[in-house]
Amino acid sequence: MPDIVNRKVEHVEIAAFENVDGLSSSTFLNDVILVHQGFPGISFSEINTKTKFFRKEISVPVMVTGMTGGRNELGRINKIIAEVAEKFGIPMGVGSQRVAIEKAEARESFAIVRKVAPTIPIIANLGMPQLVKGYGLKEFQDAIQMIEADAIAVHLNPAQEVFQPEGEPEYQIYALEKLRDISKELSVPIIVKESGNGISMETAKLLYSYGIKNFDTSGQGGTNWIAIEMIRDIRRGNWKAESAKNFLDWGVPTAASIMEVRYSVPDSFLVGSGGIRSGLDAAKAIALGADIAGMALPVLKSAIEGKESLEQFFRKIIFELKAAMMLTGSKDVDALKKTSIVILGKLKEWAEYRGINLSIYEKVRKRE
């Protein structure tokens, strides 16, 4: 178990201080153009960014996706993020709680989140491979109760597990059967999220057939977990490092993943994440088909610098989001979902090759 705790710390250290953001991959968000409206028909002061996150109202259609926890120093980061998220009315996810379920002294680094953020939605987190390894309803309930969570994320990370020195790439189909049965017993919704390589329409349809309707794309183009594990392989002299280099651009780009999930599961609740680095990125993700946008790495980096740095980061994100809403004439989040967009370049090629009819998609993304 100390290995898991140390791994959590090493992951944060590499993510924050090594070059693992984007690299040779792309979100394809540059191929999404929000159409400028020279006369928006609204004033900046009347723009309303409030929306719903399941049963709770949130101030902005942006969430902090799960990152860390497990040791005191990681708990301090979680505390800063939670305090600032509470101040801005932004949902927050925690990192995988496996370490806290199996190691009692790690629990406080997660529990602190709800203590300092009593009102915002908090999202618990466990990994899909743990279902194969024996986790069940008891562990899910423990993770939820630990932080009084409003939802629980189940993360998919096969690419990370394949290249991780101590990885457990266990994804047998009966994990989904267990997840379906567990979901019927839980009092909070399950969100299935990827970990930097995106959700395809095949995966979305498969998950939907097992009762999953909530997704977090975590697409290619943001934090590169294959690169993080490659660095860990290099540090250990592990031969997997050479192979990992060939997979640094692996995955479904964020914009493509948003389209694939929305097109294949139109009634889903969808978090668009993976390389969201600005309020404009968030606006594009929502206009393209996400319900809210999610981000992790820039939040982590700002939190490491301190509370004031993170507050300034969120102010910047919210301003940029509102600027995009103003310039598209979108007075609220529902209007942003229906705003005019143009899809160009590689994203258009991807969509057409994958059988996404753009005329039909235009109606699907607007929820018509």
UniProtKB/Swiss-Prot annotation:
According to its UniProt record, where is this protein located? Cytoplasm
Family matches, as SMART domains = IMPDH
Q: Cite the binding residues for substrate.
A: 7-8, 96-98, 160
Tell me the domain of life.
Archaea
Per its UniProt record, the required cofactor names are:
FMN; NADPH; Mg(2+)
Q: Name one GO biological process term.
A: isoprenoid biosynthetic process
Alphabetic keyword roster: Cytoplasm, Flavoprotein, FMN, Isomerase, Isoprene biosynthesis, Magnesium, Metal-binding, NADP
**Predominant location of this chain?**
cytoplasm
State any GO CC term: cytoplasm
**Residues where Mg(2+) binds:** 161
According to its UniProt entry, what is the function of this protein? Involved in the biosynthesis of isoprenoids. Catalyzes the 1,3-allylic rearrangement of the homoallylic substrate isopentenyl (IPP) to its allylic isomer, dimethylallyl diphosphate (DMAPP).
Put simply, this protein is called Isopentenyl-diphosphate delta-isomerase
Organism source for this protein? Saccharolobus shibatae (strain ATCC 51178 / DSM 5389 / JCM 8931 / NBRC 15437 / B12)
Q: What is the lineage of its organism?
A: Archaea, Thermoproteota, Thermoprotei, Sulfolobales, Sulfolobaceae
Question: What is the gene called?
Answer: fni
